């Protein structure tokens, strides 16, 4: 060992392992407006104090490692380290705590959701001192959110492009999701759009398979859109799924969609990845395409109550990365979604400023400044009897998407679309007249069905269909 090395190693450096809480648990810390704040649900291993567990999360997701290293002396840890500044027990849960961690903004690359998640959740979830760990919420400071483009267009620009105001938009996922030829697929799209829907949709796993290559699907769907527009006088769209095995192929598909003149493309943002999603969002902004986002794989990450990442965090990340629509559960359909939690992250998607509200799972006040909003999409196991509840829960700025609830109509796809459009228009009119959709919803649908045989047939088919299971993720 050289004398120079000995001198550096001996000044202020003591090798060995020390408790994380000595450095990273700082209960007196006053958070800054520029800090990224995180709320983690921490379940420590037996014998691990909550302060040590919270400090370990702060350390391992910022500057720390398992032992003291001499290169700590070459930088300012006080400037760059994450800090666990508050810990509170979770009411009604044994050995679970909410650990609040503050991260200095300089730890993160500007405009990169990928880098943000790599730091905050990239490594710490496998930490042995923790039995389980869940990221419940993030506070994104305005100084960081302003480094993101966000949604390609946002809610108001989309309404202006479509010339549709004062009601939710209606969609339909084409079924069967796999196996149709491109021509038959386009036929189903046309029938749904001419029946009164605003959009139809590729399912999340429709990419470019042997039974239907992407280019053929794009062409037949574009033909269906133009034919339906000519017949109805309304602007129509189909979410053409541009998700692909490489970013280059994804952009190539988006370019072809733009050349066809269609209004919207689609991406599976979790399986495709945030880097790919942000790239596609930038392309869509530059080329006038709307971007629909599917959240395929989300339940792998967010469904367990004590481990993973809550969807409200994934929703915030999507708003930063970019998307004009995102699937957000239904509350009333076949997929997971507790009402207050769902409404909490719906507000985080749409609104500019959202106050802290623990009753809805919102741990921090979030100010998005001028970042455009995202339309929540209600999809999964919904039908005409759900229309009053969906209209009341989600309001006008939403997309209500009926797959089986359109294509399962006994008279075919177009009558299924008519039934949904009539039900929606009836609910919107009743709401505008001051009627209570939650209390009078079934009566409103029955009244509309008297003059719409398509709606009457749909009401008869789905009158007994319910998906009543308790939500796994509750407050």
From Swiss-Prot:
Q: Can you supply one Gene Ontology CC term for this chain's record?
A: chloroplast
Q: Give the matching InterPro entries.
A: RuBisCO, RuBisCo_large_chain_AS, RuBisCO_lsu_C, RuBisCO_lsu_C_sf, RuBisCO_lsu_fd_N, RuBisCO_lsu_N_sf, RuBisCO_lsuI
Coiled coil (UniProt feature) = none
Subcellular location per UniProt equals: Plastid, Chloroplast
- How, per the record, is the cofactor bound? Binds 1 Mg(2+) ion per subunit.
For the site labelled Transition state stabilizer, the residues are 334
Q: Which residues form the propeptide?
A: 1-2
Residue positions binding Mg(2+): 201, 203-204
Annotated active site residues, numbered on this chain, are 175 (proton acceptor), 294 (proton acceptor)
**UniProt cofactor(s):** Mg(2+)
Q: Where does substrate bind?
A: 123, 173, 177, 295, 327, 379
GO BP term (any one): reductive pentose-phosphate cycle
Additional info?
The basic functional RuBisCO is composed of a large chain homodimer in a 'head-to-tail' conformation. In form I RuBisCO this homodimer is arranged in a barrel-like tetramer with the small subunits forming a tetrameric 'cap' on each end of the 'barrel'.
The protein's role, per its UniProt record = RuBisCO catalyzes two reactions: the carboxylation of D-ribulose 1,5-bisphosphate, the primary event in carbon dioxide fixation, as well as the oxidative fragmentation of the pentose substrate in the photorespiration process. Both reactions occur simultaneously and in competition at the same active site.
Q: What is this protein called?
A: Ribulose bisphosphate carboxylase large chain
Q: Which organism is it from?
A: Quercus rubra (Northern red oak)
